[in-house]
Amino acid sequence: TLFPYTTLFRSPASARSAVPEAGYFRGFDLEPVRANLISAALIYSNKRFTDVVLGANRTGHVWAANITTNQVDGYVNWVGQGRDASSQPLLSGKFQRLEIPDTRTTEFDGLLNTPPASLPALDIEAEHFVLAGKQLGRLQLKASNRADGSGWEISSLVLDHPSARFDGTGLWTRASAAAQQTNLTFTLVLHDAGQLLAVLGQPDTMREGSGKLSGRLGWRGAPVEIDIPTLEGELALALGPGQFLRTEPGIAKLVGVLSLQSIPRRLTLDFSDVFAAGFAFDTVVGQARVANGTLTTDNLLMNGVQAQVLIAGNADLLAETQALQVQVLPTINAGLASIAYAAVANPAIGIGTLIAQLLLQDPLRKLFRYEFEIEGSWAEPKVTQTRPNDAQNPADEIYGPH
């Protein structure tokens, strides 16, 4: 077991002070300048490491170390305060592997309960970053305190995985323990959304799907954990060809709701052909707003080979419930897909305007249009058809009564 013996040593700054402290000669320095350690098991600050190989050297205020354990393999630099009057401590490192086990993610709570000004600047790179057992790819993180002391700023956060690349910037402010705020702006470039969901613990939810999810989010609290009841922001999604797979809604939750598997067979259009194996889409596009943990959209469009699905409504991210209005229009004229895509790309256009444009371009679709409401929990959504497709006069359906 290794204890923090560094409290026994005199810091270089105090050792070189003009007036030596009692018991020490002027310039006397007991802080080590070199440390080497090899251990099969090491416990430090209640953390257990195995297969430890450590080599460290100090020059003035700078510690440089090579370290290899079962969780870490890389090079670390620690630059303490004192190198100049305005500087802040800097922790930098380059790792071949950096792993934070699930049992240690809670340690960040204690770390981030301190004022942002007490945190060091960070410059971290890791070729293989593992968080709570999830292989997240290459990590790059740069963060520091603002010069005016107004917060801890994340100038760059990059996670680069074969399935996706996340780029973000953020700011954490803390006036008091009860008055913290985190703001994040990000872009998630998706190479394979299905693979990414599998990495995040939701396998067999989606097949393929490439595109981009971008937006800004803010919440009360520290960056380490999103506080859903205070979550607010805006999101934009543009996703390319893929397929929602047929899974139990309780497993895939909201993604399962969007796959529309729970919509039953209808008399005129047999939805089992469209949704039974999971909805295959060419594009999924739309914008959403988030306020107090509730996500709201007016223009989410899923464009498939057999049908176009337009969704408006809201989803409560904390209660895991939704109140959605769904319009299903069979694809009779495939050329209308570009019209729908262009319309939904404009956030000012709502679902009603978009449907009107589609029906004007192809009135025949009005015969086969279906409307549904999806309510209740994500695990057990309740689907109600709100517009029966049983027109007595097809001409009236297309052109209106004469």
Report each predicted region and the residues it spans.
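Gram-negative outer-membrane assembly/targeting C-terminal domains
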Residues: 373-402
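Conserved strand-loop elements at the edges of beta-sheets that form or border functional pockets
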Residues: 58
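Eukaryote-specific, cytoplasm-facing alpha-helical/coiled-coil scaffolding segments in long proteins
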Residues: 62, 240, 398-401
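Compositionally biased, proline/threonine/alanine/serine-rich low-complexity intrinsically disordered stretches
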Residues: 6-22, 108-109, 391-402
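Small-residue helix/turn framework positions
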Residues: 6-10, 31-45, 55, 64-135, ...
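Contiguous, function-dense segments enriched for cysteine-driven chemistry
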Residues: 24-29
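Short, exposed "boundary/linker" segments that immediately precede the start
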Residues: 1-5
